[in-house]
Amino acid sequence: MDYYFTKGKPQLVNMKTPIYLVTQFQQLMDLMQNQYEVSCLELMQRSGKAACDFLVYRWPKVKKISIFCGRGDNGGQGYVLAQQAKKMGMIPTVWQVGHQMSMSKPPQMHKEVWYEMNSCHQQGIVLHTYSPDIDLGDPELIVDALFGVGLYGHVRPEIALLLQRLQQFTVPILAIEVPTGINASTGEIAGNALAATATITFLCMKLGLLINDGKIYSGEIAFDDLLAPEEIYQQVKGIEESSLLDSSTCFSKKIWYRNKTQKGWQLSIN
């Protein structure tokens, strides 16, 4: 059953979203950029702001947040979230994993990520280079913006140690796109993974969040369509194999939705 929350009171609605593999998600991203002319930077900003909106909606009393950013696009989403969080009165601290602040774009970093990293710096947001022996303080919430769907192969040993360290905190963990260490298509663990309290994913629902270990590690799921036109989901079809979602791998789960026709979040108990 699907519910729309108005002043805390649930009302029944009908809301569904297509489910995709990572390769299909990448096709959707290509269409958004090339056919619908939404830039990579704009998509990054929409997703980072949506993540912050959900954070505030789900945990309205949180003030001190720690955002762990990788050097890829997922990290860029984390940088956008940090800026939005500061505008909304929170105290964001960014932990840079595998990179550090630079006045010139590092060779392996996309220009959009570098732009958002520098925007954080210009706005006075504290940027720390992560190291295993550094004190992480006492955040009220942790944001996982390390890899998203961009993880290939197994989690490196140094990242596995970081995930173990973060898992020891007793505060909520919000993962952006996919919890680090979870394969977004298969739901399998890539050696080690971070169990999130909630995961916000964009443009389409990733199959790996709904099956196998991914269904456990993703926690509650929030979905935002990034203002994508409805036609895009006809151009790239979602999965059709019902066996991928059989009863042996799936169980009841909270899923929050928001699309371009809604201002609030809808809760579905699947």
UniProtKB/Swiss-Prot annotation:
UniProt enzyme class: isomerase
Binding positions for K(+) per the UniProt entry: 74, 144, 180
InterPro entries the UniProt entry points to: YjeF_N_dom, YjeF_N_dom_sf
Lineage of the species this protein comes from: Bacteria, Pseudomonadati, Pseudomonadota, Gammaproteobacteria, Legionellales
Protein name, entry field: NAD(P)H-hydrate epimerase
Cofactor note text: Binds 1 potassium ion per subunit.
Gene3D superfamilies: YjeF N-terminal domain (3.40.50.10260)
Superkingdom, natural source: Bacteria
Example GO molecular function: nucleotide binding
